[in-house]
């Protein structure tokens, strides 16, 4: 432990030298695992070993290997398999036990990096400790090579196991940074939110966090075991390998090329995604639905126009802007009768298709998860309506109100920093999130999600609305994991 505002911290692993960032202390690129490289590739990550001397923690670590696209290019992150690091922001490493929030980034389990999310202002405003983590992505983190090769050495869902290991690191070491290991909120957006929903069903992960925030995603993009095996065999065919050792010997570029080839073969899908493995996770979606969620407070919600973001993705947009292709997806997933009922609940217009796409992929899975949790445990639900002039309240837009994401603003928003009513909304949003992290409940004006399905709608003026998607929710019924993008192949 250090004193005052010193940025040198002593942990049981060794000393770390951080820096001052936005009035708080920050430690960047802190390893929580040994590098998963060479003979450790495709193996469960091992806890980081102790070091001698003072370790520099003033620079972000590398992002995990991925195809760097779009706005991520402006950040120019280094890519490396040695990427299992986390970033920490704290008002002070002074022995005070502050609430902790651990952030899991989104990116369809294929893209993203902890370095996109700067937690200094949240730490300063809320007197909390903010942790953002990296985890293995795509082919390196979410392909069922173990069963496909019949090799028990290869664990399932390596990317999720990385997240669990990071949570263990927080439990064991965050007190040295001014954090309370007994008050940890696990939070995420998109694939990060789906990760949170999965870890709420994991016996290994449950004891490691005490509150949960899910932004746009729950139990969707998740494969069953059969699908995960089919995907893994496609990878092995493309790579021409038959053993773990051959996989470990390949250049990472070859693995990334195989990922691109598999994705071309399975368009409009997320082939490299978590699966129900019966080990870290339940064995099936049915088992996950039937299992009780942990007795912790939950804050969850979605954005009104989620699918507008994906209209920028060629291929995905072709599905979500075609009523015929959406119908084919629904028929394949749920049968002709259910497909007809769902389609009848949405106008035959571009607006109707956008609502259907948003509900299918994000809103209904998140809403139904919240309903199930709220039956037993404290739950608060939101819909984010404040949108971009061109793209509406698209997927991920709320992140710009919560986080300091200056590196992405020029590309994503084109309008410069938050100002006026948008700045006021950002302050309200952060206040609710911070209070939830601190106390397990948001602001008093936010009514709990109950039988009325009370929902806080964030907009220029926030308002409580009962069951704002009532008609569509009733049509979707018990389908608490809508097809989402994982079910679009062949549409």
What are the language-model segments listed below?
Residues 1-157, 181, 266, 336, ...:
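Non-catalytic accessory segments of hydrolases
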Residues 13, 162, 180, 276-277:
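Acidic/polar residues in short coil/turn loops that connect beta-strands
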Residues 25, 61-76, 118, 124-125, ...:
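A structural signal for the main folded, soluble domain(s) of proteins
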Residues 33-34, 48, 57, 92, ...:
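Short loop/turn segments at secondary-structure transitions that flank enzyme active sites
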Residues 73-244, 287-310:
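Serine-hydrolase-like catalytic core of hydrolytic proteins
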Residues 165-168, 172-175, 193, 230-233, ...:
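A broad, structural surface signal
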Residues 197, 279-491:
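C-terminal subdomain of alpha/beta-hydrolase-fold enzymes, centered on the catalytic histidine
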């Amino acid at each position: 432990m250090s004193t005052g505002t010193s940025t040198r911290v002593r942990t049981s692993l060794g000393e770390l030298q951080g820096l001052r960032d936005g009035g708080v202390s920050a430690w960047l690129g802190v390893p929580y695992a040994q590098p998963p490289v060479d003979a450790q590739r495709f193996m469960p990550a091992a806890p980081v070993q102790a070091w001698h001397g003072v370790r520099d923690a003033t620079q972000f670590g590398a992002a995990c290997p991925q195809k760097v696209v779009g706005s991520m290019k402006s950040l120019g992150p280094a890519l490396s398999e040695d990427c299992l690091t986390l970033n920490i922001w704290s008002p002070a490493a002074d022995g005070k036990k502050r609430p902790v929030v651990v952030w899991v980034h989104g990116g369809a389990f294929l893209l993203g990096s902890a370095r996109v999310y700067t937690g200094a202002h949240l730490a300063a405003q809320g007197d909390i400790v903010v942790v953002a983590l990296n985890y293995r992505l795509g082919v390196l983190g979410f392909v069922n090579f173990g069963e496909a090769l019949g090799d028990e050495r290869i664990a399932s869902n390596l990317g999720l196991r990385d997240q669990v290991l990071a949570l263990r690191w927080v439990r064991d070491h965050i007190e040295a940074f001014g954090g309370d290991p007994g008050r940890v909120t696990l939070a995420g957006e998109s694939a990060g939110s789906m990760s949170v929903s999965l870890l709420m069903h994991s016996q290994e992960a449950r004891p490691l966090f005490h509150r949960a925030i899910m932004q746009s995603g729950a139990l969707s993009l998740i494969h069953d075991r059969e699908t995960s095996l089919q995907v893994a065999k496609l990878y092995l065919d493309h790579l021409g390998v038959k053993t773990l050792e051959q996989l470990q010997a390949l250049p990472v570029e070859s693995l990334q090329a195989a990922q691109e080839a598999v994705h071309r073969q399975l368009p409009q899908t997320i082939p490299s995604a978590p699966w129900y493995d019966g080990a870290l996770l339940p064995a099936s979606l049915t088992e996950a639905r039937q299992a009780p969620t942990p007795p912790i407070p939950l804050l969850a919600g979605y954005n009104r126009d989620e699918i507008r973001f994906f209209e920028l993705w060629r291929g995905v947009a072709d599905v979500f802007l075609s009523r015929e292709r959406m119908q084919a997806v629904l028929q394949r997933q749920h049968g002709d009768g259910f497909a007809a009922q769902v389609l009848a609940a949405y106008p035959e217009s571009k607006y109707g298709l956008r609502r259907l796409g948003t509900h299918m992929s994000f809103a209904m899975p998140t809403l139904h998860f919240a309903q199930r949790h709220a039956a037993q445990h404290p739950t608060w639900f939101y819909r984010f309506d404040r949108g971009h002039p061109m793209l509406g309240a698209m997927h991920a837009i709320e992140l710009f109100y919560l986080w300091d994401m200056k590196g992405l603003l020029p590309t994503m928003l084109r309008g410069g920093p938050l100002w006026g009513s948008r700045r006021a909304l950002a302050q309200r949003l952060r206040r609710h999130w911070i209070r939830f992290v601190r106390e397990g409940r948001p602001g008093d004006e936010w009514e709990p999600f109950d039988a009325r399905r009370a929902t806080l709608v964030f907009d220029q003026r926030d308002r409580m609305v009962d069951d704002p998607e009532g008609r569509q929710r009733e049509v979707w019924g018990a389908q608490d994991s809508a097809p989402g993008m994982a079910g679009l192949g062949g549409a």
